[in-house]
Every structure is written in C-alpha cells, then in structure tokens.
Amino acid sequence: YYENIFSSNFFEKVDGMKVRRKYRIRTYAKTLDMDTPIFFEIKGRNLERTYKKRMKIEYRYLDFFLNKELHCKLLNIYPGNEMIKNFVYDTFKKDIKPYILIDYIRRPYVNKFGLYFRLTFDKNLLSTRGKNLFNDKSHLSWLECKAGYTILEVKFDRSIPAWFHRIIQSYNLNRRSISKFAIGMTTCGIAEETSA
C-alpha cells in the first residue's frame, strides 16, 4: 500500500472520510518472474459508494510504480488512463510512496448462479514496513495482525441470498467494517486511531 509520513490514507479511512482513495500494488505470487500477474489498484469511497478499480501491469513497468522519480513516465506508458493520472497527481500532492506490505491467506467462494455474490475468508494476516513486494522477505519482520481471527468479506449486488441471510440470523452476526490496511498500519506502529 502507498502512504505518506502523515498517515493520510490511514486517517481518511478510520475517520470515515466520505471521499477518499488509496493505491496499492497487488499480486498473488510470492516470487517475481516475467509471467507473474501484478495489478495496480485504487480503492476508495465516493459518498455512499465504495469502489475498487484495477489494471494489470507488466513486469517491466513495476519499477515505474515503485520509484517516484519515474511516476511521470507512466503518463506516456498509459496515455489517457484516468487511474494513472490520479495516481501521479496524488503521489505529488500527498507525497505518497510504497509504505507497508500486507499478506494473508485467502479462500474465495463465488456464486456461479444468479446475482453476484462472493464470500472470502482471509486468515493469517501479516504486515510489515516495506516498499518492495519481491525483495528477499527473509529480512523483513512480519507481524501477526489479529492472530487467530479470520475475516469474512461479503460482496454482492443488490441483495444477499436467502440461505446466507439465515446464517447471519442463526449466528447473530453483525456487519463490521474491517480494513486490513488500517489493521496493518496499527500493528506496525505506524499510525494509531485516536478517540474523539
């Protein structure tokens, strides 16, 4: 995830700012080679709607995303791309840079019939200060976040299926906003929520 020394993205999230966005580089691989899928993502909120936009980036351009001195070259590599324009603007306006790594094990389940419905179970959440996804990770000090907990993430269009609604009622489950980014920032001692 990208962040600055003031933890602006963290505080925008925990303070519930209605308009915000943050950036990350994402991969599901542990090592880097020419075929490693790498994604550039923007996650944000615009009033009552949250969104995530993603684009695949080529291995050869990864350094352009990680090195601020090369960010302006992205405008030529991806001409007319709004995600890139916003990213370059925000890297200079907010002075963001790669700041923290978040890792976890994910089990996704997607409904193949009817309306879009997706469950993911994220466990073994780890975080560390760092800026490069593929450095030798043996020197990084990974910290456990919420040890023993699994995060259930529910995504759907319009409504959840009746069978899942019954599970929620049976176990008296409550909706709760969880940010793996914010948990990681807190666990690493980079930022801390303040109470009003």
Give each language-model segment a name.
Residues 1-196:
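Phosphate-end processing signature that detects enzymes handling 5′-triphosphorylated RNA
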